[in-house]
UniProtKB/Swiss-Prot annotation:
Coiled coil: none annotated. It comes from Rattus norvegicus. SMART domains: HLH, ORANGE. GO terms for cellular component: chromatin; cytoplasm; nuclear matrix; nucleoplasm; nucleus; protein-containing complex. Residues 255-272 have a biased composition (Polar residues). One of its GO terms (molecular function) is HLH domain binding. This is Transcription factor HES-1.
Length: 281
């Protein structure tokens, strides 16, 4: 009998041990299950927020574009986002145009800032030894292309017609030569024609690259046109008449001066020998 009692007493703690082992991991399982059960609810709420925002965005963009909402009741989410991006870009362009209309120096400041940043990047890449050569070349080429596009930007034609590269000059009508009086400092550009040049002329310094930045010489700005030609931008106060621009076009045969600067007499035209060629200086 005592032996049986001892066996029962010795077996009871062993039998109780599995029960205690099974009860301890219940708390982590409960927390994990709680997170798993709450995840679909969180996802459902997130999708509901996205759909609500897209619905409001759809209403706003259709009102802004003045489109009938009944005809666009089944727009996809991607269509709503694309329409919004296009609308914001148009607003950005309109703001830039308005800024240029009120302050003509905005574009010049933007170009100067971009050029300064590009120079800083170039200096860093030239001194940094850990940059891959291919990456450096691609980055500098990309910045050069961006700089060319920025230099091709012009001011709005309605607000500042004098700041655009003018078209080729049309054939002038009959009449004597007309000269625009203006007096910036030398160097001088001789104006061809029968009469003597005016007291002062626009300083000229033509770049060899079409994408070269516009430069200012003696108060006059030289702007490269996309077709490889150049135009002088003359301030309005430097003219005695209404013509605000004296365009200078470069070509293989020579340089022609716009009609506001020289108007040949009837029955005569400027020959190639009478044209000023900058490469002969």
């Amino acid at each position: 009998m005592p032996a049986d009692i001892m066996e029962k007493n010795s077996s009871s703690p062993v039998a109780a041990t599995p029960a205690s082992v099974n009860t301890t991991p219940d708390k982590p399982k409960t927390a994990s299950e709680h997170r798993k059960s709450s995840k679909p609810i969180m996802e459902k709420r997130r999708r509901a927020r996205i759909n609500e925002s897209l619905s409001q965005l759809k209403t706003l963009i259709l009102d802004a574009l003045k489109k009938d909402s009944s005809r666009h009741s089944k727009l996809e989410k991607a269509d709503i986002l694309e329409m919004t991006v296009k609308h914001l870009r148009n607003l950005q362009r309109a703001q830039m145009t308005a800024a240029l209309s009120t302050d003509p120096s905005v574009l010049g400041k933007y170009r100067a800032g971009f050029s300064e940043c590009m120079n800083e990047v170039t200096r860093f890449l030239s001194t940094c030894e850990g940059v891959n050569t291919e990456v450096r070349t691609r980055l500098l080429g990309h910045l050069a292309n961006c700089m060319t596009q920025i230099n091709a930007m012009t001011y709005p034609g309605q607000a500042h017609p004098a700041l655009q590269a003018p078209p080729p000059p049309p054939p002038s009508g009959p009449g004597g030569p007309q000269h625009a009086p203006f007096a910036p400092p030398p160097p001088l550009v001789p104006i061809p024609g029968g009469a003597a040049p005016p007291p002062g002329s626009a300083p000229c310094k033509l770049g060899s690259q079409a994408g070269e930045a516009a430069k200012v010489f003696g108060g006059f700005q030289v702007v490269p046109a996309p077709d490889g030609q150049f135009a002088f931008l003359i301030p309005n106060g430097a003219f005695a008449h209404s013509g605000p621009v004296i365009p200078v076009y470069t070509s293989n045969s020579g340089t022609s001066v716009g009609p506001n600067a020289v108007s040949p007499s009837s029955g005569s035209s400027l020959t190639a020998d009478s044209m000023w060629r900058p490469w002969r200086n």
